[in-house]
Amino acid sequence: GLNVNRPIEDDELDRLVAAADLDELVRLVDTRTSGRDWEGLFRLRERTRAAVQTGRQLWPAATLAEHRLALYGESSWACRVLDEESGRFAIGPLTEVVAQNHAWIDLAPHLPHGPRRSFVAYERALRGDVVGDEVDEVLDIPVPPQDWEPSYPMAEYNDFGVECPSPLDTARLEWHDIDDESDFEPIDDPWVDRALRSLVEPWTSSSNGRAESVVVAGSASDALHALGIRRGRLAAIDPGLAMAWLAWCGASGGAHGRRRGAATGRFEAWWMIAAIGGLTDDWDEFRECGELADEIGSVLVNTQWWCFDDGDRSSAYRLSLVASLADDDPENESATPLGVALLARDHPSIV
């Protein structure tokens, strides 16, 4: 292996760093990527990152070099950019970038034990890879997807960016108008509110977004009325699509925030389901006795899910979801169902 502490002569790189020539450094990143010069690309990353100590702001070149190494580099080189200082200005977690084009069997020997190894394992498992049992469950949920989980939307990173369309973009929906009349009892549920805010946190903290939830004793239409939506449409969707939509939201950075990655999105979706099903207080107990996955899956598949349309076309990032849960008391035949409406929006700034 390369001793990265020993100075290597690289006259072209050193000249560009000394001149703080960002444009030419980006071209050099392109050249070394296309030539598969991973050693040279890693050296570029190291020296542009160190340039800040002499007052040169070359972090865009360092960030681009990290991105290319993680995306295209041989596994040994790709894993070198997963240190604690990397990815600070990246468009998404480098653990997700690395997982896109590298198999776990090739990555595992080069990943030291710790959270980043675990995050890569989660990401690879979501892509259908078989990951061994030696990985810590740092996200509090099983590494391999469960039988009841859907195929989650995976990001596609490219040379400069990332694409990850919402699973709702291609869904075929049958709409019907919401009821004109409403009769509901509002329920204060701080767990649902906090779970939604956690789910779309980058949309609201790093961007222009908003998030709002309501819980009512009432129907799906009642829940929308409680949100202040008097005219709108509902379409039934299957539990898998609802789960995939939640996970997509949790993975996304919204219009201007930093993407958090599919592994985090999946955890946020589990936590949102737990909040809707009233399982948050018992999460740790269920996890310790190995019942958490079954409990979350049971809430998901036994809930009626709806997408709603409130006429808002301005938001590129949206969650418009209603959950309708039956009362779980078998003795209560006349129980009113529980309606949970989740609304989140984010959109690019209009200059």
Predicted segments — roles?
Residues V52, A62-G265:
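Extended, low-hydrophobicity segments enriched in charged/polar residues
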Residues N3-N5, N101, N158, N208, ...:
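Detector for Asparagine
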Residues I229-V351:
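C-terminal, beta-strand-rich globular interaction domains
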Residues D14, V26, D30, D193, ...:
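Generic detector of well-ordered alpha-helical segments enriched in charged/polar residues
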